[in-house]
A protein has these predicted regions:
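Short, solvent-exposed loop/beta-turn-alpha elements that line the ligand-binding surface or hinge
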Residues: 127-135, 178-182, 205-208, 228-247, ...
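Short helix-initiation/N-cap motifs at beta->coil->alpha
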Residues: 86-96, 115, 183-189, 261-273, ...
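Hinge/lid segment of periplasmic solute-binding proteins
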Residues: 112-160, 188-189, 298, 364-367, ...
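Mature extracytoplasmic/periplasmic domains
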Residues: 269, 287, 316-394, 430
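Glycine-centered hinge/linker elements that transmit conformational signals in sensory
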Residues: 194, 233-264
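Periplasmic-binding protein-like
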Residues: 160, 294-317
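Conserved N-terminal structural module of periplasmic/extracytoplasmic solute-binding proteins
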Residues: 2-117, 304, 323-327, 339, ...
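Extracytoplasmic/periplasmic solute-binding protein
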Residues: 150-154, 159, 186-237, 276
Length: 431
């Protein structure tokens, strides 16, 4: 191929796929490691190749960027006649992906969420790719197994707080920047300010975006401030009933039902539509902002355990038993090279040490000020902890969500509910 020297090796069909599948909730991964196959056009006979990559985003700007990179690649590699980006619904992305795999319709490349990374990486479904020294070690950890890399950490997106400064002023409340200056940017203050916003304006105070009383792992952006964990470091013991988690969940329960600082179950509020004063979300959501209100972007509030950073991650992997592994790995190398990473960083923060400075990030994130980039983005990428992950994630995720349901009632017994969560999931953690 005539593309620049790839960052990753180009194996033959299935050459670098490990063959030690683990028990998975998604049988599709086992199906792939057992029999392989993809629905992309085959290049094994020297004919033209079609590559397909599953992604979660349907955003026009995102797709324009991705298709532009694909066009550049095809110009240099005419044997690849087409590169398709197949958007799957975000709320059912992993299920849809594993269903495709189980049905013999595996893509050549796939976007993989952090919560399903352990299953994909440990299953043997992915082709090994070459490590890149420019990518921060912490960003690669989730995508490695026994010292080898099986997916490129495509997006390492720190969580922070977007604030509607106009709404806060209307409610007579301090902005996060003012609270930071006073040394009072804490979750306790968020509850007070959020409750006051609700009282004065009728709008929501604080929204944990994409939580919606379903995506419980997004609450890590709160409970990490208490030093809480859902399970032990080795993944074998439930920790929902530990004092730190009990205190964090008690705070959340009070913020929702006592202070009314956060939307209650059954209600929604979109910060970017002007319906909330503050929201916890990732830098990539900045693309949703317009000039309809004044805003700021600041680090997560401090909790009793002090300051902390949380990141969401997505990896890009090559399904290893397909017909076009060599071409897929080569395209992945091109897509994630230094030049393209700089362009992708506008929407999908890159964990490259060579690009982690405010001046470089400002070129692809013009909406954010250098101080915001330094404090939230660079600090978050360098120091952030990835949201909770575990093998058998789909089954485990559903079990936790169901066991937490009784918590979201005004008269809930927080401690007992969390004990019940552990009773529900401990057998799964021990598998």
């Amino acid at each position: 191929m005539s593309s620049p020297a790839p960052l990753h090796p180009r194996p033959g069909r299935g050459a670098l796929v490990r063959g030690k599948p683990v028990a998975l909730a998604a049988a599709g991964l086992l199906a792939l490691t057992a029999c392989g196959g993809s629905d992309g056009g085959s290049g094994s006979d020297g004919g033209p190749v079609t590559l397909r990559m599953t992604i979660w985003t349907g955003n026009e700007e995102h797709l324009k960027l991705l298709n532009g990179i694909a066009a550049d690649y095809r110009e240099q590699n005419p044997e690849v006649k087409e590169i398709k980006f197949d958007t799957l619904p975000v709320e059912s992305y992993t299920t849809a992906l594993t269903t495709q795999i189980a049905g013999g319709k595996a893509p050549d490349l796939a976007w993989i969420f952090e919560n399903s990374a352990p299953d994909f990486v440990a299953s043997g479904a992915l082709a090994e790719i070459e490590d890149d020294a420019d990518v921060l070690p912490a960003a690669k950890k989730l995508w490695q197994h026994e010292g080898k890399l099986y997916a490129y950490p495509f997006s390492t997106s720190p969580f922070g707080v977007f604030a509607n400064t106009d709404m806060l002023k209307e409610a007579g409340q301090p902005t996060p920047a003012e609270l930071i200056e006073q040394g009072r940017w804490t979750w306790d203050e968020v509850a007070k300010v959020g409750g006051a916003v609700r009282d004065e304006t009728g709008e929501a105070g604080m929204v944990i975006r994409d939580f919606d009383y379903k995506m419980w792992d997004n609450l890590a952006t709160v409970w990490d401030g208490w030093g809480a964990e859902p399970w032990s470091e080795d993944g074998g013991t439930c920790a929902f009933d530990e004092p730190e988690m009990t205190d964090a969940m008690t705070y959340l329960h009070d913020a929702v039902f006592a202070a009314e600082a956060m939307p209650a179950p059954g209600t929604t509020a979109d910060f970017f539509a002007g319906e909330a004063a503050m929201t916890v979300t990732q830098i990539s959501r900045a693309s949703l902002l317009d000039d309809s209100f004044g805003w700021d972007f600041v680090p997560l509030p401090e909790g009793p355990a002090g300051s902390y950073d949380v990141v969401g991650q997505a990896g890009l992997g090559v399904l290893g038993n397909g017909d076009n592994v060599a071409e897929a790995v080569d395209f992945l190398a091109f897509m994630t090279n230094e030049k393209n990473s700089a362009a992708l960083g506008r929407y999908f923060p890159q964990a490259r040490s060579s690009q982690l400075d405010a001046d470089t990030l400002a070129k692809s994130n013009p909406q954010l000020k250098p101080a915001q980039l330094e404090e939230v983005v660079i600090g978050g990428i360098e120091n952030g902890k990835v949201k909770p992950t575990h093998t058998n994630q789909a089954e485990l995720f559903d079990a936790v969500r169901a066991a937490l349901d009784p918590l979201w009632k005004p008269d809930a017994d927080v401690a007992k509910t969390l004990q019940d969560v552990c009773s529900a999931i401990q057998p799964q953690l021990e598998k």
